[in-house]
Amino acid sequence: MQLLVAWTVLRTFAALGRLEPVDEAREGIKVDAAPAAIVETHWPETGIRTRPWSPSKRIATMAKGTRLLVRGVVASRDNSGCKGKPWYAVYPFGYICSEHVKPGREQPLVGHALGERMRGERRLPYDYAKVREEGALMYRGVDGVRTGVAARSLSEGMNLAVARTLEVDGSAYVETVDGQLVSKSSVGWLGQGSAWHGVFLTDNAAIGPAFAWSSRDKVPVLAEPAVKAAQVGTLGLRERVDLLEETGEADPDRWWKIGEGRYVQAKNLNEVVFTAIPEGALRDNRLASGDDQWIDVDLGEQVLVAYRGARPVYATLVSSGKGSPTPKGNYPIWAKVASMTMANQDYEDNPYMVEHVPWVMLFQGHNALHGAYWHDQFGKRRSHGCVNLAPLDARWLFEWVAPALPAGWTGYLPADLERSVVVHVRDSSLPPDQAFFQERPIGPPDPEEEKRRQEEADERRAEAAAAAAEAVPAAAAAG
């Protein structure tokens, strides 16, 4: 069993190692024999860097207690990166400061990030609760409760990841995963999220419409493609149907034949349409090497299809941006994060917060593919700009997209986006010349753009405050 575990770990790490190659001889990195074969992280979050010095890019993060295989030790070049202490060269890639780890004895865990939390029939890695009281207070631990000093107040509708419930001086509280306390009476439990999930695709599929899910409950099925035709049945919510023959050119006159003498208006369906590999979604070198994953998101149909080369392998429903539309374009995934708290930016006026959103893949600025535990409206636009997935879909996609994060790892930030899986975002509901174009730049949020938006928000708020101040004496004089 020990040998099997070690072999599985090495196979996983070998696949990861190809992603971040370093020419150590050319860069003068001398790796000597290490005093330890395995190290264990002992900080709440520890980073792996591209080079054994500072500054160098952080490319991976892991939780406390994560074990790593060591391939050697590198003497420190400076005092700032690791306080003059040596670095460990670790598998599958990169270097970690020796101050951040301790010698370990057991092999690294086998499995996926967050996998240790997914026991039994769980669909989510944490228990979640929704704040149902405007102004509910959040405290930094038991001491905060007893001193009465709140860390912040919460808005109704914010979502918390809960570690446990406890009593403090006779009052019940929930303790969040991050160690904050909120009165239990101020929250309501959210359960395990939607049970919805997509489908695996095993057959060689032709390009074009394949099947669909009904977009609501009790969708009428008619005997002919006409609104006044006799009704011969109904479809339940998200019922899957084959798309056999299309009539009409535009809604509401577009219909699909789904069986003999059975027709449904296209506007009542989320259509799954397979497409050829779009330009820019998959580079030739990746296709030739077998690193051929890419993801198609159709905003018009609210459908996601995962591909390997020209072959679709999985399809499901999503919820994309509503008030803030999801940007169209080709976007390489710039970060994979096992879970992260999402909240409004300082320049946004409407506060929101959802703690420990699971299985996050950031593809453009703040926009991400991620699990959504707070709603069950997949197939409809709903988000702030991200692409929401049901929990089961989010986990599958996160583990499928290379690289798969090993157990204990909390994040991966590729040094070179050329190797990242591309998310191709289009909108089939728009005319062809508007359905796809590169709407935003690739990669993480642009600091200059963030600064500009913050300055605009500060100016807007200052003007509003000045107007409110002027209104007070005017109202008093009128009274």
What annotation goes with each model-predicted range?
Residues 22-80, 158-159:
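An N-terminus-focused feature that recognizes amino-terminal "leader" regions
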Residues 59-104, 150-188, 233-270:
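SH3/SH3-like beta-barrel superfamily modules
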Residues 231-232, 241-328, 441, 449, ...:
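Cell wall/extracellular polymer interaction/catalysis modules
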Residues 288-290, 324-330, 335-479:
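Exported/periplasmic cell-wall-interacting domains
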Residues 1-16:
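Sec-dependent N-terminal signal peptides of Gram-negative exported proteins
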Residues 44-53, 136-145, 217-226:
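Short, structured beta-strand/loop micro-motifs enriched in basic residues and often containing a Trp
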Residues 16-39, 82-134, 143-145, 175-216, ...:
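Boundary regions of SH3-family modules and the immediately adjacent low-complexity/disordered segments
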Residues 34-36, 43-45, 83-87, 171, ...:
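Extracytoplasmic
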